[in-house]
Amino acid sequence: MENWYWKYDSAINADQCAEIIKMGDNQWHSGKVDTVDGNAEVGTGRSSDIVFLDDRSVYELLEQFALDANDNAGWRYELTAAQPIQLARYRVNEFYDHHLDSIGSHFDPRPRKLSLCVALNDDYDGGKFDFTMSSGLAEEEIATGTVIVFPSFLFHHVTAVTRGVRYSLVGWYTGPPFK
């Protein structure tokens, strides 16, 4: 694979990012991890709070990046739907261990093909978004508004936040099984 991920630096303006963060006010709950058997559980591999957003404008905003990256990166996966968009909050010492998104979801049996992550702020320390590659770790510096799109079968993680609060937006795009 030539392009393991596709990055859009500061593609969403800071005001839009702040508005998205506000959508999570008073709705936060502990993030769960989907397991291989299709269940979701609060586990030791993840420590963060999440909110699933149901705002059409956010779906439309993210979809343009997913479709563009799918084409420009050369993946050209058949995508048929977007799963619920997740707003995540990581406070000091919170993290998300190495994982892949393609295992599936307890609420949608279709395979996840593309994942998308948006940095909604950058006024924190730690909280690095990394890919685990066969060649080693690919660490990305992510400024506010940066969008990263990648195949859902790539291992990735978020390191522990050491100062401040990290906010991100995550989306997944599904389609028929790979052939």
Feature names for model-found ranges:
Residues 1-147, 153-179:
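Fe(II)/2-oxoglutarate oxygenase catalytic core
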